[in-house]
Amino acid sequence: MAARVGLLQTIGKLQSSFLYRAWPKHSINAKQLARQLSSYHDIKSSNLLIEKTNKPKPKPDPNTLVFGKEFTDHALILKWSDEDGWDNPQIIPYGNLSLPPAASALHYGLECFEGMKAYRGDDGKIRMFRPLMNMKRMNNSAARACLPTFNSGEMVECIRKLIHLEREWVPHSNTCSLYIRPTMIGTQASLGVNKANSAMLFVILSPVGPYFRTGTFNPVALLADPQYVRAWPGGVGDCKMGGNYAPTILAQQNAERQGLQQVLWLFGEDHQITEVGTMNMFMFWINENGEKELVTPPLNGLILPGVTRDSLLALAKRWGEFKVTERTFNMQDVLMATEENRMLEMFGSGTACVVCPINRIFYQGKNIMIPTMENLNVTKRVYDELTGIQYGRQEGPKDWIVMVD
Protein backbone atom coordinates (compact mmCIF):
# COMPACT_ATOMS: atom_id res chain seq x y z
CA MET A 1 0.00 0.00 0.00
CA ALA A 2 2.81 2.42 0.91
CA ALA A 3 4.53 1.80 -2.44
CA ARG A 4 1.25 2.32 -4.28
CA VAL A 5 0.57 5.58 -2.48
CA GLY A 6 4.12 6.78 -3.09
CA LEU A 7 3.74 6.11 -6.80
CA LEU A 8 0.44 7.96 -6.89
CA GLN A 9 1.91 10.91 -5.02
CA THR A 10 4.77 11.04 -7.56
CA ILE A 11 2.26 10.98 -10.40
CA GLY A 12 0.32 13.68 -8.59
CA LYS A 13 3.38 15.92 -8.34
CA LEU A 14 4.20 15.46 -12.03
CA GLN A 15 0.62 16.15 -13.10
CA SER A 16 0.36 19.09 -10.72
CA SER A 17 3.53 20.59 -12.21
CA PHE A 18 2.15 20.15 -15.73
CA LEU A 19 -1.21 21.63 -14.80
CA TYR A 20 0.44 24.63 -13.17
CA ARG A 21 2.52 25.36 -16.28
CA ALA A 22 -0.46 24.90 -18.60
CA TRP A 23 -3.11 26.66 -16.48
CA PRO A 24 -1.40 28.66 -13.70
CA LYS A 25 -4.68 30.26 -12.64
CA HIS A 26 -6.21 26.83 -12.05
CA SER A 27 -3.26 24.96 -10.50
CA ILE A 28 -4.06 21.84 -8.48
CA ASN A 29 -2.31 20.99 -5.24
CA ALA A 30 -0.27 17.77 -5.61
CA LYS A 31 -1.65 16.25 -2.42
CA GLN A 32 -5.21 16.91 -3.52
CA LEU A 33 -4.56 15.32 -6.91
CA ALA A 34 -2.86 12.29 -5.39
CA ARG A 35 -5.83 11.87 -3.06
CA GLN A 36 -8.19 11.97 -6.02
CA LEU A 37 -6.14 9.27 -7.77
CA SER A 38 -6.09 6.96 -4.75
CA SER A 39 -8.67 5.60 -2.33
CA TYR A 40 -6.01 5.60 0.40
CA HIS A 41 -7.41 8.75 1.97
CA ASP A 42 -11.03 7.62 1.78
CA ILE A 43 -12.82 5.76 4.57
CA LYS A 44 -11.64 2.18 4.99
CA SER A 45 -13.66 -0.07 7.27
CA SER A 46 -10.74 -2.52 7.46
CA ASN A 47 -8.78 0.15 9.38
CA LEU A 48 -11.47 0.51 12.06
CA LEU A 49 -10.10 0.87 15.60
CA ILE A 50 -12.26 -0.13 18.58
CA GLU A 51 -12.00 1.11 22.17
CA LYS A 52 -14.64 -0.53 24.36
CA THR A 53 -16.21 1.17 27.35
CA ASN A 54 -15.45 -0.12 30.83
CA LYS A 55 -18.75 1.28 32.13
CA PRO A 56 -21.55 -0.34 30.09
CA LYS A 57 -25.02 1.00 30.83
CA PRO A 58 -28.08 -1.14 31.62
CA LYS A 59 -30.33 -1.75 28.61
CA PRO A 60 -33.76 -0.05 28.78
CA ASP A 61 -37.08 -1.88 28.83
CA PRO A 62 -38.53 -1.68 25.27
CA ASN A 63 -41.94 -0.86 26.76
CA THR A 64 -40.58 2.39 28.21
CA LEU A 65 -38.76 3.63 25.09
CA VAL A 66 -39.59 7.01 23.58
CA PHE A 67 -37.87 8.54 20.58
CA GLY A 68 -34.27 9.71 20.87
CA LYS A 69 -33.75 9.85 24.65
CA GLU A 70 -31.54 6.80 25.25
CA PHE A 71 -28.11 6.26 23.69
CA THR A 72 -25.87 3.22 23.45
CA ASP A 73 -22.43 2.75 24.97
CA HIS A 74 -20.31 3.59 21.91
CA ALA A 75 -20.06 6.00 18.98
CA LEU A 76 -18.30 5.86 15.63
CA ILE A 77 -15.98 8.82 14.96
CA LEU A 78 -14.16 9.78 11.74
CA LYS A 79 -12.11 12.93 11.25
CA TRP A 80 -11.22 14.58 7.95
CA SER A 81 -8.83 17.31 6.91
CA ASP A 82 -8.34 19.00 3.57
CA GLU A 83 -4.66 18.09 3.66
CA ASP A 84 -4.80 14.42 4.71
CA GLY A 85 -8.30 13.22 3.87
CA TRP A 86 -10.08 10.76 6.16
CA ASP A 87 -8.34 9.40 9.25
CA ASN A 88 -8.90 5.82 10.37
CA PRO A 89 -12.44 5.28 11.69
CA GLN A 90 -12.74 4.71 15.43
CA ILE A 91 -15.38 3.26 17.73
CA ILE A 92 -15.02 4.87 21.15
CA PRO A 93 -17.10 5.10 24.33
CA TYR A 94 -20.08 7.45 23.94
CA GLY A 95 -19.29 10.88 25.33
CA ASN A 96 -19.18 14.59 24.67
CA LEU A 97 -17.38 16.03 21.65
CA SER A 98 -14.55 18.55 21.89
CA LEU A 99 -14.89 21.47 19.46
CA PRO A 100 -13.36 24.94 19.16
CA PRO A 101 -15.91 27.69 19.88
CA ALA A 102 -15.23 29.06 16.39
CA ALA A 103 -16.10 25.77 14.64
CA SER A 104 -17.94 26.53 11.40
CA ALA A 105 -20.78 24.13 12.24
CA LEU A 106 -21.64 26.21 15.31
CA HIS A 107 -21.80 29.53 13.47
CA TYR A 108 -22.81 28.91 9.88
CA GLY A 109 -24.51 25.53 9.90
CA LEU A 110 -21.88 23.57 7.95
CA GLU A 111 -23.58 20.33 8.89
CA CYS A 112 -25.64 17.47 7.52
CA PHE A 113 -27.06 14.29 9.00
CA GLU A 114 -28.97 11.12 8.28
CA GLY A 115 -31.49 8.85 9.95
CA MET A 116 -31.91 5.12 9.46
CA LYS A 117 -32.73 2.06 11.54
CA ALA A 118 -31.73 -1.47 12.44
CA TYR A 119 -34.38 -4.02 13.42
CA ARG A 120 -34.33 -7.24 15.41
CA GLY A 121 -36.47 -9.75 13.57
CA ASP A 122 -38.66 -12.51 14.94
CA ASP A 123 -35.74 -14.83 14.11
CA GLY A 124 -33.45 -12.83 16.41
CA LYS A 125 -31.33 -11.56 13.52
CA ILE A 126 -30.53 -7.87 13.14
CA ARG A 127 -31.17 -6.12 9.83
CA MET A 128 -30.32 -2.65 8.54
CA PHE A 129 -32.83 -1.23 6.07
CA ARG A 130 -31.42 0.33 2.86
CA PRO A 131 -28.40 1.96 4.54
CA LEU A 132 -26.57 2.46 1.25
CA MET A 133 -29.34 4.75 0.00
CA ASN A 134 -29.05 6.81 3.19
CA MET A 135 -25.29 7.15 2.77
CA LYS A 136 -25.64 8.21 -0.84
CA ARG A 137 -28.15 10.85 0.26
CA MET A 138 -25.76 12.00 2.96
CA ASN A 139 -23.05 12.43 0.34
CA ASN A 140 -25.42 14.63 -1.66
CA SER A 141 -26.13 16.76 1.41
CA ALA A 142 -22.42 16.98 2.24
CA ALA A 143 -21.51 18.08 -1.27
CA ARG A 144 -24.17 20.82 -1.14
CA ALA A 145 -22.57 22.18 2.06
CA CYS A 146 -19.01 21.83 0.69
CA LEU A 147 -18.30 19.15 3.27
CA PRO A 148 -16.21 16.09 2.35
CA THR A 149 -17.79 13.08 0.67
CA PHE A 150 -16.88 9.46 1.30
CA ASN A 151 -17.23 5.90 0.06
CA SER A 152 -20.83 4.98 0.90
CA GLY A 153 -20.22 1.23 1.03
CA GLU A 154 -17.25 1.55 3.37
CA MET A 155 -19.27 3.80 5.66
CA VAL A 156 -22.11 1.28 5.77
CA GLU A 157 -19.63 -1.40 6.80
CA CYS A 158 -18.27 0.81 9.61
CA ILE A 159 -21.81 1.35 10.87
CA ARG A 160 -22.57 -2.37 10.61
CA LYS A 161 -19.58 -3.09 12.84
CA LEU A 162 -20.76 -0.48 15.35
CA ILE A 163 -24.22 -2.07 15.50
CA HIS A 164 -22.69 -5.52 15.85
CA LEU A 165 -20.76 -4.27 18.88
CA GLU A 166 -23.96 -2.74 20.28
CA ARG A 167 -26.25 -5.63 19.23
CA GLU A 168 -27.69 -6.07 22.73
CA TRP A 169 -29.09 -2.54 22.43
CA VAL A 170 -31.32 -3.50 19.49
CA PRO A 171 -34.75 -3.92 21.15
CA HIS A 172 -36.36 -7.35 21.32
CA SER A 173 -39.62 -5.94 19.99
CA ASN A 174 -41.58 -5.74 16.75
CA THR A 175 -42.60 -2.13 17.45
CA CYS A 176 -39.19 -0.77 18.52
CA SER A 177 -35.88 -0.45 16.70
CA LEU A 178 -32.36 0.96 16.89
CA TYR A 179 -32.21 4.44 15.37
CA ILE A 180 -28.93 5.28 13.63
CA ARG A 181 -27.88 8.94 13.45
CA PRO A 182 -24.82 9.75 11.30
CA THR A 183 -23.85 13.43 11.45
CA MET A 184 -21.12 15.44 9.73
CA ILE A 185 -19.97 18.83 11.00
CA GLY A 186 -17.43 21.39 9.88
CA THR A 187 -14.81 21.79 12.61
CA GLN A 188 -12.57 24.50 11.15
CA ALA A 189 -11.94 27.24 13.72
CA SER A 190 -12.65 30.33 11.65
CA LEU A 191 -15.26 33.07 11.64
CA GLY A 192 -14.98 33.47 7.89
CA VAL A 193 -17.82 32.08 5.79
CA ASN A 194 -15.82 29.54 3.81
CA LYS A 195 -15.58 25.89 2.90
CA ALA A 196 -14.45 23.91 5.94
CA ASN A 197 -10.90 22.54 5.79
CA SER A 198 -11.62 20.06 8.58
CA ALA A 199 -14.67 18.03 9.49
CA MET A 200 -15.93 15.28 11.76
CA LEU A 201 -18.34 12.48 10.90
CA PHE A 202 -19.85 10.65 13.86
CA VAL A 203 -22.56 8.05 14.34
CA ILE A 204 -24.60 7.56 17.50
CA LEU A 205 -27.25 4.92 18.15
CA SER A 206 -30.53 5.19 20.04
CA PRO A 207 -33.04 2.44 20.88
CA VAL A 208 -36.42 3.96 20.08
CA GLY A 209 -40.13 3.39 20.42
CA PRO A 210 -42.89 5.19 18.46
CA TYR A 211 -41.99 8.64 17.12
CA PHE A 212 -45.33 10.26 17.94
CA ARG A 213 -46.82 10.42 21.42
CA THR A 214 -50.04 9.09 19.89
CA GLY A 215 -48.28 5.73 19.50
CA THR A 216 -47.72 3.33 16.62
CA PHE A 217 -50.06 3.67 13.65
CA ASN A 218 -52.44 6.07 15.37
CA PRO A 219 -53.66 8.97 13.18
CA VAL A 220 -52.29 12.51 13.41
CA ALA A 221 -53.83 15.89 12.60
CA LEU A 222 -52.00 18.56 10.59
CA LEU A 223 -51.77 22.35 10.50
CA ALA A 224 -51.60 23.70 6.94
CA ASP A 225 -50.56 27.34 7.32
CA PRO A 226 -49.32 29.09 4.15
CA GLN A 227 -47.56 31.88 6.08
CA TYR A 228 -44.66 29.50 6.77
CA VAL A 229 -42.51 28.02 3.98
CA ARG A 230 -40.08 25.14 4.49
CA ALA A 231 -38.27 25.13 1.11
CA TRP A 232 -38.08 26.98 -2.20
CA PRO A 233 -36.59 26.44 -5.68
CA GLY A 234 -32.81 26.56 -5.69
CA GLY A 235 -32.61 26.00 -1.95
CA VAL A 236 -31.68 22.94 0.09
CA GLY A 237 -35.09 21.42 0.74
CA ASP A 238 -33.88 18.15 -0.73
CA CYS A 239 -30.89 17.94 1.63
CA LYS A 240 -30.90 16.65 5.19
CA MET A 241 -29.36 19.59 7.03
CA GLY A 242 -30.00 20.99 10.47
CA GLY A 243 -30.77 24.38 8.95
CA ASN A 244 -33.90 22.92 7.38
CA TYR A 245 -35.28 21.91 10.76
CA ALA A 246 -34.64 24.74 13.24
CA PRO A 247 -36.91 27.22 11.38
CA THR A 248 -39.79 24.72 11.49
CA ILE A 249 -39.99 24.55 15.28
CA LEU A 250 -42.05 27.74 15.68
CA ALA A 251 -44.71 26.48 13.27
CA GLN A 252 -44.64 23.09 15.00
CA GLN A 253 -45.28 24.76 18.36
CA ASN A 254 -48.19 26.68 16.85
CA ALA A 255 -49.64 23.40 15.64
CA GLU A 256 -49.28 21.75 19.04
CA ARG A 257 -51.00 24.67 20.77
CA GLN A 258 -54.00 23.97 18.55
CA GLY A 259 -54.03 20.27 19.40
CA LEU A 260 -52.39 19.25 16.11
CA GLN A 261 -49.41 16.92 15.84
CA GLN A 262 -47.58 18.07 12.71
CA VAL A 263 -47.25 20.85 10.10
CA LEU A 264 -48.27 20.31 6.48
CA TRP A 265 -45.83 22.46 4.51
CA LEU A 266 -47.29 24.37 1.58
CA PHE A 267 -45.57 26.21 -1.26
CA GLY A 268 -46.59 28.81 -3.81
CA GLU A 269 -49.70 30.88 -4.40
CA ASP A 270 -51.73 27.75 -5.13
CA HIS A 271 -50.65 26.16 -1.81
CA GLN A 272 -48.92 23.11 -3.22
CA ILE A 273 -48.47 20.26 -0.76
CA THR A 274 -44.82 19.38 -0.11
CA GLU A 275 -43.97 17.58 3.15
CA VAL A 276 -45.50 16.80 6.52
CA GLY A 277 -43.11 17.81 9.30
CA THR A 278 -40.62 14.97 9.37
CA MET A 279 -42.47 12.92 6.75
CA ASN A 280 -43.11 12.65 3.03
CA MET A 281 -46.77 12.95 2.05
CA PHE A 282 -49.03 10.44 0.25
CA MET A 283 -52.64 10.74 -0.86
CA PHE A 284 -54.81 7.83 -2.05
CA TRP A 285 -57.90 9.10 -3.84
CA ILE A 286 -60.16 8.81 -6.83
CA ASN A 287 -58.75 11.40 -9.21
CA GLU A 288 -60.63 13.69 -11.61
CA ASN A 289 -60.66 10.92 -14.22
CA GLY A 290 -62.33 8.44 -11.90
CA GLU A 291 -59.13 6.41 -11.34
CA LYS A 292 -57.87 5.18 -8.00
CA GLU A 293 -54.47 6.79 -7.60
CA LEU A 294 -51.69 6.92 -5.03
CA VAL A 295 -50.01 10.29 -5.47
CA THR A 296 -47.02 11.90 -3.76
CA PRO A 297 -45.19 15.19 -4.47
CA PRO A 298 -42.33 14.95 -7.00
CA LEU A 299 -38.61 15.21 -6.30
CA ASN A 300 -38.38 18.80 -7.52
CA GLY A 301 -35.96 20.10 -4.90
CA LEU A 302 -38.69 21.11 -2.43
CA ILE A 303 -38.87 17.82 -0.54
CA LEU A 304 -36.47 15.32 0.95
CA PRO A 305 -36.00 12.22 -1.24
CA GLY A 306 -37.13 9.86 1.49
CA VAL A 307 -35.89 6.28 1.64
CA THR A 308 -39.25 5.15 3.02
CA ARG A 309 -41.00 7.16 0.31
CA ASP A 310 -38.99 5.42 -2.39
CA SER A 311 -39.69 2.03 -0.81
CA LEU A 312 -43.46 2.57 -0.61
CA LEU A 313 -43.60 3.69 -4.24
CA ALA A 314 -41.74 0.54 -5.27
CA LEU A 315 -44.11 -1.69 -3.28
CA ALA A 316 -47.26 -0.02 -4.63
CA LYS A 317 -46.00 -0.20 -8.21
CA ARG A 318 -45.19 -3.88 -7.74
CA TRP A 319 -48.82 -4.55 -6.75
CA GLY A 320 -50.03 -3.09 -10.04
CA GLU A 321 -53.55 -2.53 -8.70
CA PHE A 322 -53.93 1.23 -9.09
CA LYS A 323 -52.19 4.24 -10.58
CA VAL A 324 -49.03 5.39 -8.76
CA THR A 325 -47.93 8.94 -9.55
CA GLU A 326 -45.31 11.47 -8.47
CA ARG A 327 -46.76 14.89 -9.26
CA THR A 328 -47.72 18.24 -7.81
CA PHE A 329 -51.08 18.62 -6.07
CA ASN A 330 -52.45 21.36 -3.85
CA MET A 331 -54.93 22.14 -1.10
CA GLN A 332 -57.68 22.89 -3.62
CA ASP A 333 -57.35 19.32 -4.88
CA VAL A 334 -57.72 18.05 -1.31
CA LEU A 335 -60.75 20.26 -0.63
CA MET A 336 -62.54 19.22 -3.80
CA ALA A 337 -61.79 15.54 -3.26
CA THR A 338 -63.18 15.59 0.28
CA GLU A 339 -66.30 17.54 -0.77
CA GLU A 340 -66.95 15.10 -3.62
CA ASN A 341 -66.22 11.99 -1.50
CA ARG A 342 -63.23 11.10 -3.68
CA MET A 343 -60.70 11.28 -0.84
CA LEU A 344 -59.85 7.84 0.51
CA GLU A 345 -56.66 8.01 2.59
CA MET A 346 -53.70 10.23 3.45
CA PHE A 347 -50.54 9.21 5.25
CA GLY A 348 -47.00 10.34 5.94
CA SER A 349 -43.88 8.22 5.61
CA GLY A 350 -40.41 8.42 7.08
CA THR A 351 -37.70 6.49 8.87
CA ALA A 352 -38.77 7.72 12.30
CA CYS A 353 -42.52 7.13 11.95
CA VAL A 354 -42.49 4.48 9.16
CA VAL A 355 -46.09 5.05 8.00
CA CYS A 356 -48.44 7.40 9.84
CA PRO A 357 -52.18 7.82 9.02
CA ILE A 358 -53.60 11.34 8.71
CA ASN A 359 -57.21 11.98 9.72
CA ARG A 360 -57.53 15.78 9.79
CA ILE A 361 -56.05 18.94 8.26
CA PHE A 362 -56.72 22.37 9.75
CA TYR A 363 -56.54 24.86 6.87
CA GLN A 364 -57.65 28.50 6.76
CA GLY A 365 -59.86 28.13 9.81
CA LYS A 366 -61.54 24.95 8.62
CA ASN A 367 -61.15 21.31 9.59
CA ILE A 368 -60.82 18.99 6.61
CA MET A 369 -61.66 15.47 7.71
CA ILE A 370 -59.74 12.70 5.96
CA PRO A 371 -61.41 9.24 6.07
CA THR A 372 -58.13 7.33 6.35
CA MET A 373 -59.10 5.24 9.36
CA GLU A 374 -62.42 4.30 7.75
CA ASN A 375 -60.61 2.87 4.73
CA LEU A 376 -57.00 1.89 5.58
CA ASN A 377 -56.71 -0.32 2.50
CA VAL A 378 -53.45 1.21 1.26
CA THR A 379 -52.09 2.83 4.45
CA LYS A 380 -52.24 -0.36 6.52
CA ARG A 381 -51.08 -2.52 3.65
CA VAL A 382 -47.90 -0.54 2.93
CA TYR A 383 -47.18 -0.38 6.66
CA ASP A 384 -47.57 -4.13 7.11
CA GLU A 385 -45.54 -5.00 4.04
CA LEU A 386 -42.72 -2.56 4.76
CA THR A 387 -42.37 -3.53 8.43
CA GLY A 388 -42.61 -7.18 7.40
CA ILE A 389 -39.52 -6.69 5.25
CA GLN A 390 -37.71 -4.65 7.90
CA TYR A 391 -38.28 -7.25 10.63
CA GLY A 392 -37.59 -10.20 8.33
CA ARG A 393 -41.12 -11.60 8.29
CA GLN A 394 -41.28 -11.47 4.50
CA GLU A 395 -38.97 -11.13 1.53
CA GLY A 396 -38.31 -7.81 -0.15
CA PRO A 397 -35.90 -6.66 -2.85
CA LYS A 398 -32.52 -8.24 -2.13
CA ASP A 399 -30.57 -4.99 -1.91
CA TRP A 400 -32.89 -3.49 0.74
CA ILE A 401 -31.53 -5.47 3.68
CA VAL A 402 -28.01 -5.56 5.14
CA MET A 403 -27.57 -8.26 7.78
CA VAL A 404 -25.63 -7.19 10.86
CA ASP A 405 -24.92 -10.66 12.27
Curated annotation (Swiss-Prot):
Classification via InterPro entries: Aminotrans_IV, Aminotrans_IV_CS, Aminotransferase-like, B_amino_transII, BCAT-like_C, BCAT-like_N, BCAT_family
Reactions mediated catalytically: L-leucine + 2-oxoglutarate = 4-methyl-2-oxopentanoate + L-glutamate; L-isoleucine + 2-oxoglutarate = (S)-3-methyl-2-oxopentanoate + L-glutamate; L-valine + 2-oxoglutarate = 3-methyl-2-oxobutanoate + L-glutamate
EC number: 2.6.1.42
Any one Pfam family match given in the protein's UniProt record, by short name: Aminotran_4
Cystine pairs: none
Annotated SUPFAM superfamilies: D-aminoacid aminotransferase-like PLP-dependent enzymes (SSF56752)
Listed cofactors: pyridoxal 5'-phosphate
Keywords: Amino-acid biosynthesis, Aminotransferase, Branched-chain amino acid biosynthesis, Pyridoxal phosphate, Transferase
Gene3D superfamilies assigned to the protein according to its UniProt record, in alphabetical order: 3.30.470.10, D-amino Acid Aminotransferase, subunit A, domain 2 (3.20.10.10)
One GO BP: L-leucine biosynthetic process
Residue positions where N6-(pyridoxal phosphate)lysine is found in the record: K240
GO MF annotations in UniProt: branched-chain-amino-acid transaminase activity; L-isoleucine-2-oxoglutarate transaminase activity; L-leucine-2-oxoglutarate transaminase activity; L-valine-2-oxoglutarate transaminase activity
GO cellular component term of the entry, any: mitochondrion
Secretion signal, residue range per the UniProt entry: none
Alphabetized NCBIfam families for the sequence: ilvE_II (TIGR01123), PRK13357.1 (NF009897)
Family according to the record: Belongs to the class-IV pyridoxal-phosphate-dependent aminotransferase family.
Job of this protein: Catalyzes the first reaction in the catabolism of the essential branched chain amino acids leucine, isoleucine, and valine.
Quaternary data: Homodimer.
Name of the protein described by the UniProt record: Branched-chain-amino-acid aminotransferase
